[in-house]
Every structure is written in C-alpha cells, then in structure tokens.
C-alpha cells in the first residue's frame, strides 16, 4: 500500500537560503507538508495533506527561527481535487487560496505551471523539510534540495505493479539512496522552471527499486486554471 511520502529529503543537500522562493511550508502548529506558490494568492499541494485549517508560510529557510523574510498567511479556501482517492492516492492535488495575496519579492515568488509534460530523463529539483533518514527520523530546520531525473513510465510501473495511474510520475533513483520522504509531501518537483510534480507517496524512502511517486501536474493545468478562475 502507498505510504505517505510526507516529510523530508534523503540524500540531498541544504538549499541555498531562499533559493527556492516558490516553496511554502504548510503549518498547523508545526510544519506538516510542503506546497508551491503558483500565483500571489494560490498555492498547490497534495490532497493527502488536507487539513481544515492551514497557515501558509512563505519566504522560509529555517522553519524553526524567524529570519525576517517570512510571510505567514492563513488559508481562506482549501480545495482538494474532486476525484482524489485516499486509498490509491490518484489525483493527489489540492489548491489553497490565501486570505490575502502574498507580497512577491526575491524570496517569495511563483513557479510556472507546465507547458507540456516532462520527458523521461529530465532533471528536476525536489525540495522540502521532510525526514532526512531512510530509517529512523531526523527532521531538518533548513530547507533540503535534491536533483533527480524523471523516470520512464515503464520503470515506474514495474517498481509499483498495479499502483501507478496516468496521473502519477516517478522521479528519483532506482538504486535508492536519494528520495523525498515524510514531511516533503505536497512540495514541488520543478523541471526546467516548470512545476511538473507534487510529492505524493512511495514505499519507504530512498529504498532500492522504490522511487518516489509524484502527482503528474501537467494533467491538471486546466483544472487548476478553472478552479482559480471560479474562486
């Protein structure tokens, strides 16, 4: 069964401070998921991250210390995909409307939606404050980054027989060792400047032949645009 890939990067590196200006932290008393700023008033995350009350934290690097660039904005609307399946994690995407627009600057900025889907082999940047250990747990204060390629559909499906839908992509390394993990859920996979994935699920973290599975954002551009227009 899928286990929520919900909190941290294994085998990555500490991102340069504020170098991922579209990365947000979803907070409900503490960090619980990531997200991506797609316009000044909307964030995209994973539907399995849903909570009824969410504070969006932007401009973060060290989530445990006030460093001066943060913006904390409560969610006004939280909209999960109407066809989200909590068992299979199909359609694992959610939109959050901020109660007021974020102030955009060098440390808080939007990421583009995909203009087309990403080909296998495309290198992407995954980021988050999730667990940094594949066994045991260690949650970082500083945002972690990982460069990883989009895997072919065939290797993705052979890693997870019967569990990969057309709305999922695998990104990572079949040899293991580098992956997103618990606490990274909802966060971005950005390839060539476009948001191509949302951290969704996986079997453990950084295990051999069990790469991370991500929501295939290119399938949802119309839904995102229509939902924003209607809300």
Curated annotation (Swiss-Prot):
InterPro entries: Peptidase_S1_PA, Peptidase_S1_PA_chymotrypsin, Peptidase_S1A, Serine_Proteases_S1, Trypsin_dom, TRYPSIN_HIS, TRYPSIN_SER. Residues 9-229 form the Peptidase S1 domain. Disulfide bonds join 15-145, 33-49, 117-218, 124-191, 156-170, 181-205. The active site is at 48 (charge relay system), 92 (charge relay system), 185 (charge relay system). Keywords: Calcium, Digestion, Disulfide bond, Hydrolase, Metal-binding, Protease, Secreted, Serine protease, Zymogen. Binds 1 Ca(2+) ion per subunit. Its EC number is 3.4.21.4. GO terms for cellular component: extracellular space. GO terms for molecular function: metal ion binding; serine-type endopeptidase activity. Ca(2+) binds at residues 60, 62, 65, 70. GO terms for biological process: digestion; proteolysis. It is found in: Secreted, Extracellular space. Residues 1-8 form a propeptide. It catalyses: Preferential cleavage: Arg-|-Xaa, Lys-|-Xaa. CDD domains: Tryp_SPc. It comes from the Eukaryota. The record marks 179 as: Required for specificity. Its cofactor is Ca(2+). The keyword Repeat does not apply. Belongs to the peptidase S1 family. This is Trypsin. It comes from Sus scrofa (Pig).
